[in-house]
């Protein structure tokens, strides 16, 4: 898997670093995944992991790691993971060039 296929922005890396530091656990990594659901067919999910699975692709921004499993990877190739703060609240978002449609809030998509 090409390590340049996904990008973790500086904003997202800074937020992960902040959350990781608040937990006092430098081993935490951001896991990004795709699951069925949402109004457009697929949804993005985010959680923290302490270990890398055998089928994970690993992407790095400074001292922050982002993990994507092999199934989700095929839907996320070329995507940019960012962190935004706005009227809708603060959240991680995925700018996915593979998505043909997205819902209004951007949390689900179809291909």
Swiss-Prot record:
NCBIfam families assigned to the protein according to its UniProt record, in alphabetical order = iron-sulfur cluster assembly accessory protein, PRK13623.1
Q: What does this protein do?
A: Required for insertion of 4Fe-4S clusters for at least IspG.
User: For this chain's UniProt record, which GO biological process terms are given?
Assistant: iron-sulfur cluster assembly
Key word Iron present? yes
> PANTHER family, from UniProt?
IRON-SULFUR CLUSTER ASSEMBLY 2 HOMOLOG, MITOCHONDRIAL
Report which superkingdom the organism of origin falls in: Bacteria
The family database entries (InterPro entries) matched by this protein are listed as:
FeS_biogenesis, FeS_cluster_insertion, FeS_cluster_insertion_CS, FeS_cluster_insertion_RrpA, HesB-like_dom_sf
Q: Which GO terms describe its molecular function?
A: 2 iron, 2 sulfur cluster binding; 4 iron, 4 sulfur cluster binding; iron ion binding
What Gene3D superfamilies does its record include? Answer: HesB-like domain
Q: Which organism is it from?
A: Acinetobacter baumannii (strain SDF)
The record lists iron-sulfur cluster as bound by 39, 103, 105
Required cofactor(s): iron-sulfur cluster
Keywords on record = Iron, Iron-sulfur, Metal-binding
Give the UniProt family note.
Belongs to the HesB/IscA family.
What is the annotated signal peptide range for this record?
none
Q: How is the cofactor bound?
A: Binds 1 iron-sulfur cluster per subunit.
Q: Which Pfam families match?
A: Fe-S_biosyn (PF01521)
In its UniProt entry, what is this protein called? Iron-sulfur cluster insertion protein ErpA
Complexes and interactors: Homodimer.
